[in-house]
Amino acid sequence: MTKADIIESVYEKVGFSKKEAAEIVEMVFDTIKETLERGEKIKISGFGNFIVRDKKSRVGRNPQTGEEIEISARRVLTFRPSQVLKNALNGEVSDETTEGADDDDDEEGEGDE
């Protein structure tokens, strides 16, 4: 599914004009992007969490030459689906509501990978 497909779906389901649907979808993605750029976690109940993690620099190895190289520190984006989404993907009916279903996905205590 592409961004254009999402815009089309919003247009068909909500009844906004295509221009309005496109503007809304763009605003949502811009907000998500800006939040992640600030390093903040995004938690969408019933869907999942987007988490920015800082990875430390480390020594790696060139697999072709065996030479050691330094891999610089960087930020990585991870997505952790909610249990509700996992169940839906597997065709399971969940008794859980979407409210609070992601509360067990707290990443704060995890270290660098």
From Swiss-Prot:
Residues 93-113 have a biased composition (Acidic residues). This is Integration host factor subunit alpha. Heterodimer of an alpha and a beta chain. CDD domains: IHF_A. Keywords: DNA recombination, DNA-binding, Transcription, Transcription regulation, Translation regulation. InterPro entries: Hist_DNA-bd, Histone-like_DNA-bd_CS, IHF-like_DNA-bd_dom_sf, IHF_alpha. It comes from the Bacteria. HAMAP family: IHF_alpha (MF_00380). It comes from Anaeromyxobacter sp. (strain K). Gene3D superfamilies: IHF-like DNA-binding proteins. GO terms for molecular function: DNA binding; structural constituent of chromatin. The gene is ihfA. This protein is one of the two subunits of integration host factor, a specific DNA-binding protein that functions in genetic recombination as well as in transcriptional and translational control.
